[in-house]
UniProtKB/Swiss-Prot annotation:
The keyword Ribosomal protein does not apply. It catalyses: 1-(5-phospho-beta-D-ribosyl)-ATP + H2O = 1-(5-phospho-beta-D-ribosyl)-5'-AMP + diphosphate + H(+). Signal peptide: none annotated. Belongs to the PRA-PH family. One of its GO terms (cellular component) is cytoplasm. This is Phosphoribosyl-ATP pyrophosphatase. The lineage of its organism: Bacteria, Pseudomonadati, Pseudomonadota, Gammaproteobacteria, Pseudomonadales. It comes from Pseudomonas fluorescens (strain ATCC BAA-477 / NRRL B-23932 / Pf-5). Disulfide bonds: none annotated. Its EC number is 3.6.1.31. It is an enzyme of class 3 (hydrolase).
Length: 110
């Protein structure tokens, strides 16, 4: 895992037990999963809009910024659920060399 992800995962874990007024992340944890999911949704929409704008303008700076926000809030969500970013990286590794069609077919039906 990248050093940045490792450091971020460590900080996110530390903030779980911090006072709500001590940091933005601690305040999200104290507000609960629904607030965190709201932020993930908000950042998803902002990332989509930034990508559409980048396709027109050729300037990807906003899409990079918004993607960082989306990843960040997704990592907060995973931490809230007791999951580590390594679990996502492991899943991506598992999919390497596997056709997208084969991967989709291997999923249990919902």
């Amino acid at each position: 895992m990248s050093d940045t992800l490792t450091r971020l995962a460590q900080v996110l874990e530390e903030r779980k037990d911090a006072a709500a007024d001590s940091s933005y992340v601690a305040s999200l944890y104290h507000k609960g999963l629904n607030k965190i999911l709201e932020k993930v949704g908000e950042e998803s929409v902002e990332t989509i809009i930034a990508a559409k704008d980048a396709a027109i303008s050729g300037d990807c700076s906003d899409v990079i910024y918004e993607t960082a926000d989306l990843w960040f809030h997704t990592l907060v969500m995973l931490a809230q659920l007791g999951q580590h970013p390594q679990a996502v990286l492991d899943e991506l590794d598992r999919r390497f060399g596997l056709s997208g069609h084969a991967e989709k077919a291997s999923r249990p039906s919902a």
